C-alpha cells in the first residue's frame, strides 16, 4: 500500500504545525518521521491515520484519495507510545478486540479469532502470556502486545507514534531491532514517529527529517547522515562540532572524526583541554580553541596515545579527519 502526502498544511490557531508537506511512501517501506518536539511529525502521522483533518492538501492510499474517509475506513493499525491496552482484558482478549468489533458480516467466528490471535502472539513471541493481564507484563511486553493488536485486523498501513518512547534505553534498543526484523517478515507499509536519531537510523528504510512544520531532508539513513542538506540536519543526526573559518564560513565535524596529538603537527589546531570524560570504551575530550566561541569535543579510544597523563589546562593539537562545509 503506497501513501502519498500532497501539499498538506495544518494550523492550530496561530501555530502552523505543517506547511505544505509533500511525501511519497512506497508499498512495503518502513519510513521514520524524525525531528524535535513540535516539528509536526505526530500531526502528520495523525493526518495520515485520519485522526486529524488537514486545512489544505490530501492523503492518497494506493492511488485513492482518502482525505474525506473516516479513520475506521482507512484500515490503518495505530500503535501509541503508552500501549493503550485494556486493563480489564487478558492479553488474548486485547489482541482479539479488533476482530470481535468488526461488523457481523466481516467478523470471523471464535475459532478463527483464536487461531489468528495465537498466530500473532507467536509472531511477537508472547503466546505464553495469553492469559495474563496488562499489569502483569513488562513495558516491552505490553508494547509488543499493542503491536499484535494493531496487526490483528490486517491493516493496509501500520502507524507508530513514538512506540518505544516510554521504555528504558536497553529495552528500546532490543525492541527496535525486533521491529526491524518483524517488518522484513510482514512487509507492511509502516510509518513511525521518533525524536531519537539512533532509533531512526537503525530501523528505517528512509528517514524524513522534519523541523518547524517542513521537511528538511528525505533519504536513506546513510544518505542523510553522510550528506546532510543543511546545518539543522547535520546537528540533529548526531553530536557535532562547529569550527569557524571567519569570512569563509564554518566547517562541521563529528567528535569521533577528530585526530588528536600531544605534538604540534602541520594542519592541526592548538587547543586547551577543558574536560576529560571517560565513556567506557571511549574518552571524550573537550577543547577550547582561542578565537572560537564554541567548544570542540573529540572522542577517541580510551587507550589513545594522546590521553596518557593528560590533564586539564594542557594543550592538545587536533584536526578534523572528515568535515562538511555548509
UniProtKB/Swiss-Prot annotation:
It is a peripheral membrane protein. Its EC number is 7.3.2.3. ATP binds at residues 35-42. The complex is composed of two ATP-binding proteins (CysA), two transmembrane proteins (CysT and CysW) and a solute-binding protein (CysP). Keywords: ATP-binding, Cell inner membrane, Cell membrane, Membrane, Nucleotide-binding, Sulfate transport, Translocase, Transport. Belongs to the ABC transporter superfamily. Sulfate/tungstate importer (TC 3.A.1.6) family. Pfam families: ABC_tran (PF00005), TOBE_3 (PF12857). This is Sulfate/thiosulfate import ATP-binding protein CysA. One of its GO terms (molecular function) is ABC-type thiosulfate transporter activity. Part of the ABC transporter complex CysAWTP involved in sulfate/thiosulfate import. Responsible for energy coupling to the transport system. The lineage of its organism: Bacteria, Pseudomonadati, Pseudomonadota, Gammaproteobacteria, Pseudomonadales. It comes from the Bacteria. It comes from Pseudomonas syringae pv. tomato (strain ATCC BAA-871 / DC3000).
